[in-house]
Amino acid sequence: MRLLCLNAWGGVLHEALMPWIAGVGADVLCLQEVVHTPGAGKDWLEYRDGAHVLPQRARMLDELRAVLPGHAVLFSPAGSGLLWEGDQAVPSHFGLACFVRETIPVIGQATGFVHGAYSDHDYGAHPRPRNAMVLRLWAEGRPWVVAQMHGLRDKAAGKADTPERAAQAERFAALIDGLAEPGDAVVACGDFNVRPDSQTLRRLERLGLSDLVTGGGFAGTRTARYTKPDRFADYLMVNAQVPVRRFEVIRAPEVSDHCPLWLEA
């Protein structure tokens, strides 16, 4: 099975991202920061949060569907709010998407919030609500559990451990543990928004998972588009039942301010 994990940055690098996604050949794609704006009349809108302004690909989810016609999609918004075209507000949704090749049966699933709760107003208060998605699949003649989370962003603490992040890790672990059965191959991935020494990873290790990013000696998971000093945010963890054949933190082409994580097993 070939699995891709990526924080897609709201499609900011759309011109590079879409052809790369279309041709990468992943069976399962776990994507964070996916934008879905039903009925949007423009390709690009703006996200505005005080001085922070970022272009967003308005119909990103639909465009992903178009370049992945052989995949089923599950989309789970963490929040909804407004994007902007000049002074015109456009309602939009923002969250997680998982694309699964149609030849791979989805035999179980669970979604839930790991921080806060869904808000349909202004994407929720800071730190924004965050959710996780867990799928149980039948692939390579056996059951797999694939889980993804987009960890909370804390402007004050940066990527340091906080009580909120500890609670988030407990909820993510509970979602995984609630769906996985003994003997399942388990993959947990995402933009966890924490450092390599975080208690988030220690909590997931108690599920029998080990991280391939730090374990593989990679220098980080952020691209040149990200200018802050912390170079780690994204992780991909597996249990002993996952027969890892290849794992890579992909540095080129740049399709986001995060590097894609690629697993073949």
What are these regions (language model features)?
Residues 35-143, 248-252:
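Structured beta-strand-rich core segments of catalytic domains in phosphoester-bond hydrolases
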Residues 177-186, 193-265:
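Metal-dependent phosphoester-hydrolase catalytic domains
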